[in-house]
Curated annotation (Swiss-Prot):
It comes from Gallus gallus. Glycans are attached at residues 449, 530. GO terms for molecular function: beta-catenin binding; cadherin binding; calcium ion binding. Keywords: Calcium, Cell adhesion, Cell membrane, Cleavage on pair of basic residues, Glycoprotein, Membrane, Metal-binding, Repeat, Signal, Transmembrane, Transmembrane helix. This is Cadherin-7. It is a single-pass type I membrane protein. Cadherins are calcium-dependent cell adhesion proteins. They preferentially interact with themselves in a homophilic manner in connecting cells; cadherins may thus contribute to the sorting of heterogeneous cell types. The lineage of its organism: Eukaryota, Metazoa, Chordata, Craniata, Vertebrata. Three calcium ions are usually bound at the interface of each cadherin domain and rigidify the connections, imparting a strong curvature to the full-length ectodomain. The chain crosses the membrane at residues 608-628. Residues 629-785 are cytoplasmic. InterPro entries: Cadherin, Cadherin-like_dom, Cadherin-like_sf, Cadherin_CS, Cadherin_Y-type_LIR, Catenin-bd_sf. Residues 49-153, 154-262, 263-377, 378-482, 482-599 form the Cadherin domain.
Length: 785
């Protein structure tokens, strides 16, 4: 099979491509015969394909399929018996072959940047048998590149920085553009760089894309940022080449090329003399056009009469010099100060020393203003002593204060009573002499810390404070006593001379040479036969037994008076009683029982007799309980004598709420008795504020009259009682509103006499309701007749 002839137009296109390709190697077509021949007993089959590679231009936009080339087999005699078959990459989809002629066409637009070549296979088949007449052969279709891709900056846009004042040619940044066209074919992918914007400050190397400074001494303080536009163009920058652009932002970084400078040669500030220590007097700042570390500076006072009075430090955030006060100001001593202050950069660049010096000086004058100051004591703390035996009015000491101002106003003194709540001391307002105002007790408070106030006579608001520590000197005014509450025991089997207790003493006083106590028994106890006392001469004493044979049954507790004397002048003494209990001890002398035991003597009764006595006692108790119970349960007869007085009570059934409070029983006989005067009954829910009116005694009159007077008397009491009316009474208000439909259900209307209700049936209810039937019945005697 061999490469066929091409059409004339296509041939011209191929010739033009070959002229553009310098040094391109193209394989010559080679022929091989399919006829085998034999040599030296060996058989070799020659290749029958004319093998080659085809070239086709990319981006073909014609309406007809693009002719690629022609395949031809030597077996093909041109009679149509041979059929050509194409397989491989893009076969049938991109490339098609004429099975009769072997012509290959491209049916789609090809892009070399997507795929640079296609590998295909071709074979000749017998049309009748569909069997290959030759082995399959492989060939390549290469896509010929055209300049259809512009250069692109894949990393753009760019940002870069370069120090200010850099020399010409200082590299800033390198930009790179890529072209997707074939770099091995022509100049389609050969890119050159140029600068479209940013001149004359910067330049770019055409081949490498390195951006460099083009002007010397660019000043950041004048302009700190530049925007560059860089172009990349293929075809070596020739006309007709494609191009792409990117932006580069170049920032000039700061260098220390500006020295600090004070805006003024001198400053003046006024401060009051009362300004506290560490207060800020002033803030000054030297201007520096640099930024960051290049603008950092330090301040120091290099000269002046305020070197020890003021100091200066740096505010790291604002780079200001902060002048603060170190010593208290006194207008009367000095009225002004002068300071020479230097500001200098901390990081100096040796390359720019010629622009210096990188420091500056200024003068600061501080004027001290007079302030009305409070009085000042001659001493911050006064220490005084006084004996606790000092009498009232004893002089303890003197304090002194003066007005530091030029006016020197008189000073008056007083004691801050918050520091002397008990008012133990007084002070003379004019002289400052401190005296005792009450008796002192060192044991209560050994040191008194008081505050003395000094005020100007002309301006009492100006107050100075002095502190006085008054120490109370001790005298021997407290007698010694036991150091603790002793619990002393002695065993019943104790032997004579046995130590049962060691005692010591304490004294609230504080003698200069320490305590020395002397112990002895009192005169009345010195000759006792039970115990003795031994003074150990070391502020302790030992209690010993004088005999043996202690018995709890005879005496369980002994009281031993001990006389203790101190060594003060004059000496004081006290008598302290030591309680000694007799105990039953074990073999080791450890107390087991110290309480007196009750010993029961034999009564001569047997156990059975004791049980019988106890049974009789229990029987008597049970009988007494039964008798009491029966008396309480004694029932009254069902039928009552009509003449017997009945104590009416309101009996509640199924009570769902609070009713009236008047549930007390009344003795009918008491109502008829002329000699009995009813006591005033007070309400339970309120406390009356006035006394009830006295009530007259009742005469012997009919029962209905008695009840009527009784009820009217109660109503009268309720009307005149200002505390609170009873639950069951008529209450008058300015406005009560509309009445309830159900009306009152909490009580009976005992005053109304116009009721239409017939209560005659109450007479049939028995003797219990006889009195109620008499009150509400229709008999001739009505309650309110």
């Amino acid at each position: 099979m061999k490469l066929g002839k091409v059409e004339f137009c296509h041939l011209l296109q191929i010739i033009a491509l070959f002229l553009c390709l310098s040094g391109m190697n193209q394989a010559e077509p080679s022929r091989s015969r399919s006829k085998p021949y034999f040599q030296s007993g060996r058989t070799r089959t020659k290749r029958s394909w004319v093998w080659n590679q085809f070239f086709v231009l990319e981006e073909y936009m014609g309406s007809d399929p693009l002719y690629v080339g022609k395949l031809h087999s030597d077996v093909d005699k041109g009679d149509g018996s041979i059929k050509y078959i194409l397989s491989g990459e893009g076969a049938s989809s991109i490339f098609i072959i004429d099975e009769n002629t072997g012509d290959i066409h491209a049916t789609k637009r090809l892009d070399r940047e997507e795929q640079a070549y296609y590998t295909l296979r071709a074979q000749a088949h017998d049309r009748l048998t569909n069997k290959p007449v030759e082995p399959e052969s492989e060939f390549v279709i290469k896509i010929q590149d055209i300049n259809d891709n512009e250069p692109k900056f894949l990393d753009g846009p760019y940002t870069a920085g370069v120090p200010e004042m850099s020399p010409v040619g200082t590299s800033v940044v390198q930009v790179t553009a890529t072209d997707a066209d074939d770099p091995t074919y022509g100049n389609s992918a050969r890119v050159v760089y140029s600068i479209l914007q940013g001149q004359p400050y910067f330049s770019v190397e055409p081949k490498t894309g390195i951006i460099k400074t083009a002007l010397p001494n660019m000043d950041r303080e004048a302009k700190d940022q530049y925007l560059l536009v860089i172009q990349a163009k293929d075809m070596v920058g020739q006309n007709g080449g494609l191009s792409g652009t990117t932006s580069v932002t170049v920032t000039l970084t700061d260098v220390n090329d500006n020295p600090p400078r004070f805006p003024r040669r001198s400053y003046q500030y006024n401060v009051p003399e009362s300004l506290p220590l560490a207060s800020v007097v002033a803030r000054i700042k030297a201007a520096d056009a640099d930024v960051g570390p290049n603008a950092e500076m330090e301040y120091k006072i290099v000269d002046g009469d305020g070197l020890g009075v003021f100091k200066i430090s740096v505010d790291k955030d604002t780079q200001e010099g902060i002048i603060t006060i170190q010593k208290e100001l006194d207008f009367e001593a000095k009225t002004s100060y002068t300071l020479r202050i230097e500001a200098a950069n901390m990081h100096v660049d040796p390359r720019f020393l010629s622009l210096g010096p990188f420091s500056d000086m200024t003068t600061v004058k501080i004027i001290v203003e007079d302030v009305d100051e409070p009085p000042v004591f001659t001493s911050r703390l006064y220490s005084m002593v006084v004996s606790e035996a000092a009498k009232v009015g004893t002089i303890i000491g003197t304090v002194a204060a003066h007005d530091p101002d030029a006016s020197n106003s008189p000073v008056r003194y007083s004691i801050d009573r918050n520091t002397d709540l008990e008012r133990y001391f007084n002070i003379d307002a004019n002289s400052g002499v401190i005296t005792t105002a009450k008796s002192l007790d060192r044991e209560t408070n050994a040191v008194h810390n008081i505050t003395v106030l000094a005020m100007e006579s002309q301006n009492p608001a100006q107050i100075g404070r002095g502190y006085v520590a008054i120490t109370i000197l001790d005298i021997n005014d407290n007698a010694p006593e036991f150091a603790m509450e002793y619990e002393t025991t002695v065993c019943e089997n104790a032997q004579p001379g046995q130590i049962i207790q060691k005692i010591s003493a304490i004294d609230k006083d504080d003698p200069p040479n320490g305590h020395q106590f002397y112990f002895s028994l009192t005169a009345e106890a010195a000759n006792n036969h039970n115990f003795t006392l031994q003074d150990n001469k070391d502020n302790t004493a030992t209690v010993l037994t004088r005999r043996n044979g202690f018995r709890r049954q005879e005496q369980s507790v002994f009281y031993l008076p001990i006389f203790i004397v101190d060594s003060g002048s004059p000496s004081l003494s006290s008598t302290n009683t030591l309680t000694i209990r007799v105990c039953d001890c074990d073999a080791d002398g450890i107390a087991q029982t110290c309480n007196a035991e009750a010993y029961i003597l034999p009564a001569g009764l047997s156990t059975g007799a004791l049980i019988a006595i106890l049974a009789c006692v229990l029987t008597l108790l049970v009988l007494v309980l039964l008798i009491v119970t029966m008396r309480r349960r004694k029932k009254e007869p069902l039928i009552f004598d009509e003449e017997r007085d009945i104590r009416e009570n309101i009996v509640r059934y199924d009570d769902e709420g609070g009713g009236e409070e008047d549930t007390e029983a009344f003795d009918m006989a008491a109502l008829r008795n002329l000699n009995i005067i009813r006591d005033t009954k007070t309400r339970r829910d309120v406390t009356p504020e006035i006394q009830f009116l006295s009530r007259p005694t009742f005469k012997s009159i009919p029962d209905n009259v008695i009840f009527r007077e009784f009820i009217w008397e109660r109503l009268k009491e309720a009307d005149v009682d200002p505390c609170a009316p009873p639950y069951d009474s008529l209450q008058t208000y300015a406005f009560e509103g509309n009445g309830s439909v159900a009306e009152s259900l909490s009580s009976l209307d005992s005053i109304s006499s116009n009721s239409d209700q017939n209560y005659d049936y109450l007479s049939d209810w028995g003797p219990r309701f006889k009195r109620l039937a008499d009150m509400y019945g229709s008999g001739p005697d009505c309650l309110y007749s």
